[in-house]
């Protein structure tokens, strides 16, 4: 789960396991596996970094 910011400047939490693709248009367009799309203010690099940080946190807890 990662915190992202909509174009309307509202923060929301996205389940990053459902991301199918990221595009810059110039905002970042996130397409989920169910076809739903989100436009966010973060760059693709920022979204990827947030996902990496989240995954490292989850996998380092030893579940």
Language model features with spans:
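Eukaryotic intrinsically disordered, low-complexity regulatory linkers and tails enriched in Ser/Thr/Pro
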Residues: 1-13, 17-63
């Amino acid at each position: 789960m990662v915190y992202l910011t909509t174009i309307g400047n509202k923060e929301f939490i996205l389940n990053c396991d459902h991301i199918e693709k990221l595009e810059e248009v110039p905002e970042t367009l996130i397409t989920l596996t169910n076809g739903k799309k989100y436009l966010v203010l973060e760059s693709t690099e920022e979204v990827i970094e947030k996902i990496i940080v989240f995954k490292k946190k989850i996998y380092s807890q030893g579940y």
